[in-house]
Amino acid sequence: SNEITGSGKTEDLVENHKLLNDLCHKLDATRPTTMAHIFMLDANDPLVFLPDIRSYNLYYGWYVGEWDQNDAWFDEFHKNHPDAVIGLSEYGADANPAYQSAKPAKGDWSEGYQAVYHEHMLKMWADRPYIWAMHCWNMFDFGADGRDEGGKPGQNQKGLVTFDRKTKKDAFYIYKAYLSKEPFVHICGRRYADRTESETKIKVYSNQPRVTLFVDGKEFAAQDGDKIFKFTVPISGEHTIEARS
């Protein structure tokens, strides 16, 4: 079940899920049962502990609060229930690749904010081995008739890839940095072309240990790092930026 208590919890609802949980075990005792809980459900509610393992849909850093509240939520749950298997069944932030900003912020639908949000979420997961799984919402932008936001009516834009499957947003590549063994470098913010600042931030994602940045064909700087590499580059006109590893 997904967010089954979104409209409230009743005795019938709980009893029905007890029956379903028992049926699942009867059909295949080797497979654990699980539920995806809406974030409003108290983490100490008995329903949370009905299945063998459980996950929560949390949107701190997008719909509510700040992204570090995800960290605090999991730390508190694990402290109170150290033997309970817990995961993250939904999380995400909307982004329209046409929206660019030098100072991305929550709620601006910018590609840059989505990227830094997912940077945080992946580090949170990597730092907490007790989180059994995270399920990013979503791989692709998808149709949502009731939505009219972020410049694209009828779409949920939480995907790491656009609705037409043609454009990988910057956030796609931070997942590649964590999860892929295929060597790569990716310069973020490439759609942010018209920049007004005299010094601009260039961010590179890579699964390689060292990245070298070239500006107008000349080596600018090299960095050793882990997945995220940041450079400050003076700009005064049109420039060509290249990253190599």
Role assignments for model-derived ranges:
Residues 1-224, 232-244:
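Extended substrate-binding grooves/exosites of carbohydrate-active enzymes
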